Amino acid sequence: MGRYALDMEKYADLARTASAEGCVLLKNDNSTLPLKKGDKVAVFGRMAFHYYKSGLGSGGLVNTRYVVGILDALRACKDIALDEELIGIYEKWIKDHPYDEGEGWGLVPWSQEEMPVTEEMLQTASGDDVALVILGRTAGEDQDNTDKLGSYKLTRTEEDLIRKVSSQFSRTVVILNVGNIIDMKWVREFDPAAVLYAWQGGQEGGNGVCDVLTGRVNPCGKLTDTIAEDISDYPSTSNFGDLQKNYYKEDIYVGYRYFETFAKDKVLYPFGFGLSYTSFSVQASAEEKDEHTVCVKATVKNTGTKPGKEVLEVYAKAPQGVLDTPVRVLCGFAKTKELAAGEEEHITLEIPKNTFASYDDSGVTGHRDCFVLLEGTYTIYVGTDVRMAQKAGSYPQTFTVIEQLEEVCAPQKPFARMTRKPGDVIGYSDTPERIYGPYDRVEKPAEISQTGDKGYRLEDVYDKKISMETFVAQLSDEDLIMLFRGEGMCSPKVTPGTAAAFAGLTPSLRKFRIPAECASDGPSGIRMDCGTKAFSLPNGTLLGCTFNCELVRQLYEMTGLELRLNRVDTLLGPGLNIHRNPLNGRNFEYISEDPFLTGKMGAAQLQGLNIAGSTGTIKHFAANNQETKRHEADSIISVRALREIYLKGFEIAVKEGPARSVMTTYGPVNGVWTAGSYDLNTIVLRKDWGFSGIVMTDWWAKANHEGQPSDPRIHAVMAAAQNDVYMVTADAQDMQQDDMLEEFQKGNLTRGQLQRNAINILQFVLKSPAMLYEMNRISPEELKDRKNAAKDDPDVSKMMKFMADEQGNIRISGDGWDTHQGKEILADLDMKAGSYELQMKVKSNLDDLAQLPVTVYLDNIIKGTLSFRGSKGQWVTQQIRFDTFEGHHYMKLYFGATGLTVDHIAFQLSGGADKEQ
């Protein structure tokens, strides 16, 4: 197998291993797990039949060749026997209570209707050895969780299910197929013997869960979030979900930083917690190695009877002085190899002190806007979760300025933020007055004198025949503006069905041999809306729970090869936002409440992608901590909380990945939309962290001028802030779609700024696979491996193509369509922006009791289901409405039952679309 060949068996094995290592065992009374050889297993819960491989939105829309659910994997396991009679009862009920796909984007149910457990079911399973209760939850992009039954909380039917099954079976295991933590008070009330967080494990997820249940893999996952008694116990809850402003009053006291400092009694399961089928001992010492480093030495021993892995976690406690600090901060971790019973492993971690430095944003230490080490005693704790970590050593520290920075993104007005008072009492103090406005420090780089076309091509820069500046000098002002604009979604200029094309998109730019770059949605796999298959990865939270950077690195090396195979230059991921609150619907994409763990896991993903010569786009920069009104709701945060919590994970990934591409958010931070924030995109990223890649907006992002509302036409402020690529437009050549040319002509956007951004983009291009294709320098080995790759995907080149007429309408005949159950009709539609009515005219010879659903997808997003019934040979028409943007779209019609004849479908344009859909 060649270097660039994608070994799907290895890919699946790595994903399966990650899925298993990310499972977190919270409870296992009387060694209920692992299942014993010969056990007869009763499986309860309808979600056994509907596995959630990922959360909702762009991060989950991966077309897979297969998905292994938990029940699928259990059925394939020869060491146990399933109660098929009980399974049959569920299957019969599900026929009358089908899976509810919801109404489309942002309108999908958080959970599915659960089958009420009956005495008949309990009697059927009465002779079984063990019961598995499988529950599921989903949420995602544009769809936060809510503190309601069926979302964050269990429904009454689910509670009744656990209560009755736990009462009958001494060995009851509750398995949570969820993207995020949920309310867990029911564990104490109903007392099931075992509880397992299985998360959302991608297409190999069911196999991973089965491996843990059967003992093939000893559970070794650890919580990346604190599970508290009640949602109201999280200090962010009272300031989460507002439609206009969310004050981050908890400041740096996020997750365990809050609970371990102020509210230990509110914790059900602490950060870093997770059980094993064996036991371990940890002996550790810590001491100051030098003025920059702390050295931790530990011995982890398997003191039980089964082989297993353990996670060593290191926390620092800073002295409490003029600058308040949490009582614990994660500063290091390591996962052991699999240790046999009685075996031990010696681990040495050298931890830079700047890992646990504190940020002074007020000058209370005499050093405003600095990371500092405080005078006093620093204590190091080592253990297997934040609560069980024991003191391993301490050392005296003199006051030290670690890094002098500058104020960024400061709140417009002071607000009260949480502080730690003597005696670990909660206090509040105002954030400092800001010094700089958002535009006070915007630089206007000197322009490069334009030369016009001198015959140089980008390949000449690659070959070091000319400088990048000499090349960019050839580009006209219009070229520079067009280079700023990406196109999508589903641009025909790059891999079909992907999120965007950018760089060489226009004839004038292509003249200079600038290739079109391809970006695909992630992070849970490659999204290609034309139907091309890709590998669905475990979600971000699950990967974080592995605490295994090397495993994640190896997994994403395979994803990097898959990107190259599909000619995708960057995957839009990993997601590195903080789990500020459990109700954020997009937490499944992100990793943890802790920034250090988030950054290390993000860096591991990037390192894997980079090994394969691909890369990822870390997102969403920064503070995308709720989906409700994400385009408008202002995140009001202190500079200290930004620097220590919400930016830190990005910083680690930028420096250690390294990252080459960053995506900003939709919304504002402290009154300034991040897409146009010079503080974030230039000062923090490039000056403070040394980032040299590209920054792109989120899709159809907006910006503003401070004190003014946002506007989708305001793009010039983005370019001035060094946000290099606007995502996305229908046509990069359209000079009337935004304010770029107008602001350039006014002098508010300079040629030097556009040239600077162009250099950023083109430096990215030079390191991409697309550039190798442009120069015809892809190695013969890679070309051979691509040619030999198995393909069972739709042939996009042969897909039906239709273009809207002058009125924006499209009509497609249904002659010859195969509409048998499970069949699909695919088409490439070139549509205008606006509100469409889709009309579908069909007939059926069946009687009116026949149910004949047709589900309509556009770009892999469900737009609705037409619920036809038998019409006894009469033609009938149904309609659905939706909005869309201008450009190419991939339509799929899925026929849920056999029996329809289609006359035609028609798309009729009725009005302009809101681009913030």
Roles of regions detected by a PLM:
Residues 1-388, 409-844, 853-917:
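Glycoside hydrolase catalytic-domain context in secreted enzymes
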Residues 388-412:
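Short beta-strand elements
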